[in-house]
Amino acid sequence: MRHFVTPLLALGCLIGNAAAAWPNGPFKTSGRWIVNANNEKVKLAGANWPGHGEVMVPEGLQYQSIKGVLSDIKGIGMNAIRLTYATEMVDQIYANGGKDIDIKTAFEEGLGKENGTIVLAKVLKNNPTFTAKTTRLEVYDAIAAECLRQQIYIDLDNHISEGKWCCGGEDGNTWWGDTQFDTAKWVRGGAYMAAHAKKWPAKVTQSLRNEPREPTNNNKLRDASYNWSDLYKYMRQGADAVHQADPNAIIVISGMNYDTYVTPLYSGEKMKPRGEVFNRDDFKGYGKDKLVLEIHTYENKGTSCPSLRYNLYNKGFQAMNESDPNVAEVFPVMLTEFGQAMNGADYETAKTYVSCLSQYLPEMQASWFIWVIVGRYYTRQGIQEFDDSWGMKKADWSGWKNDQYIETYLKPQIKGTLR
């Protein structure tokens, strides 16, 4: 019998194939854009989901399921998360003969046996597919699997070496060679996570290091190494290791001074003190189409939108403008951190910043991640159940802390970015 395919059936097949194709990797860069395997632009509008604290398990699971957290993100239109981890997690795996520790151990070591046991019970209740023997990386895998189901992209970010709150000039994690920032372990950790996460289809990018900064309590290290020449040297080492472990990964490079500017990486200027000039050939086999830059801004007390726009452009977004004569290398540039208090006087003070970013980021068509999708942390800066005033979620993660911000500023920012 001869079969005929109706137009409606054919259309249905096409739609089904398109849906099944998400996220349609591998990804690459093309000029100022990240593109998928069909050369379609991939723009990211998302939130930071921290997993780099003392427990080294992504936050909030004592209050919500993984599905619930990601559904809330997706529910307001976001399509991405910046998922953070600490190098110490990988160090512990190597110290344990290559085996990750289970979340029972992680919570007890991070919170103490009594509180760790209590919090773990809540995590298991909200996430019944887990057991006490589930490992930390299996939690990350579950997040990645749910991201795939909900079509949420992942930027995997090495946030800090030592599992704890970040960041400060005296925390030992500032710069390569600081007391807690072992370069060889950092390279090893990036490669390990790249190899592990290459099985996550939703992973688009991998960030090498969050907020390189001046070691303010280590003058010897600062004077010897805190400069663009060394940042470039170390970023090449980290990028090579990640690329070797996962050749499909787009690699995200950050800048100096808490990653507030990356200008020397795209301007063609000579980096101090040794005079290097950024060269894609220094990233052999991937420099042409696997590199992205990232910047941060926390100028949330400013009263001038033109000033904020000027700083963002000249410290990073300029690299997306191929017609700018001061741009030697065109890159996609992501704003991977920005944020402010979600209510009270500090929120009111940040209104210029908030409204300016809500307009400027869509205008620039820049990918971005707000800081931060939390309510209470497992622990932060020695305080268990720390309630972050900057967190987007209510203390118990039950809803948004400031619906007016979400509706008036964030949703239009999301929609405009992803248009």
Which role does the model predict for each range below?
Residues G60-Q64, F130, T134, E138, ...:
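Soluble non-cytosolic domains of exported or imported proteins
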Residues M1-A20:
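Fungal secretory targeting signals
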Residues N300, W400-R419:
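Aromatic- and carboxylate-lined catalytic core of secreted/periplasmic carbohydrate-active enzymes
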Residues Y85-Q92, A144, R149, Y153-N173:
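Aromatic-lined carbohydrate-binding surfaces of glycoside hydrolases
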Residues A95-R136, C166-Q180:
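Aromatic- and acidic-residue-enriched carbohydrate-binding clefts of CAZyme catalytic domains
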Residues G177-D178, A184-T205, R209-S367, G375, ...:
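Extracellular glycoside hydrolase catalytic/binding regions
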Residues T84-M89, H159-W165, R209, N257, ...:
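Short, solvent-exposed turn/loop segments enriched in Gly/Ser/Thr/Pro and often Arg
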Residues G16-R82, I93-G116:
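N-terminal carbohydrate-binding accessory modules
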